[in-house]
């Protein structure tokens, strides 16, 4: 889990993203797919589609909403070691089942702080806290075999 201070940095940097969660969720997925085009192929609704087609897809909002809400759960529980352990275990098992592994989340970790910064300037130290959160996810996926 993260320290209380790290969890606070996550919450402060996440709040502006979550305040406009629908548009920001869509924008995050598009930014991920632009930075890592193969990422779209891990989503059945987007496999083989162009960015323009994904943007126009009625499925974009439902997929991005699930991602934003799951991230919100991680942010809200980041300092609770017990809850995080259970959440990470469930998350990693689900994602291994989807064929998603640690490399895909290394990609997310590399671009997510920049995405957060594009919404609102985060407090100092927030990028490192996001890196640590995604590091926990990556470690859980590796432990689950991916």
UniProtKB/Swiss-Prot annotation:
One of its GO terms (cellular component) is hemoglobin complex. The keyword Cytoplasm does not apply. Residues 1-146 form the Globin domain. The modification N-acetylserine is found at residue 1. It comes from the Eukaryota. It holds the Pfam family Globin. InterPro entries: Erythrocruorin (IPR002336), Globin (IPR000971), Globin-like_sf (IPR009050), Globin/Proto (IPR012292), Globin_lamprey/hagfish (IPR013314), Mb-like_M (IPR044399). Heme b binds at residue 95. Gene3D superfamilies: Globins. GO terms for molecular function: heme binding; iron ion binding; oxidoreductase activity; oxygen binding; oxygen carrier activity. CDD domains: Mb-like. Keywords: Acetylation, Heme, Iron, Metal-binding, Muscle protein, Oxygen transport, Transport. Belongs to the globin family. This molluscan globin lacks one of the heme-binding histidine residues found in most other globins. Monomer. This is Globin. It comes from Bursatella leachii.
């Amino acid at each position: 889990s993260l320290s209380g201070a790290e969890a606070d940095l996550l919450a402060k940097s996440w709040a502006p993203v979550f305040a406009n969660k629908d548009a920001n969720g869509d924008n995050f997925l598009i930014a991920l797919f632009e930075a890592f085009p193969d990422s779209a192929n891990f989503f059945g609704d987007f496999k083989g589609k162009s960015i323009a087609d994904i943007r126009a897809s009625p499925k974009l909002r439902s997929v991005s909403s699930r991602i934003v809400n799951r991230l919100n759960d991680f942010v809200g529980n980041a300092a609770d070691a017990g809850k995080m352990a259970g959440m990470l275990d469930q998350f990693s098992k689900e994602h291994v089942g989807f064929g998603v592994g640690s490399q895909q989340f290394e990609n997310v970790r590399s671009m997510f702080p920049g995405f957060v910064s594009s919404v609102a300037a985060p407090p100092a130290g927030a990028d490192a806290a996001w890196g640590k959160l995604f590091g926990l996810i990556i470690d859980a996926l590796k432990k689950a075999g991916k």
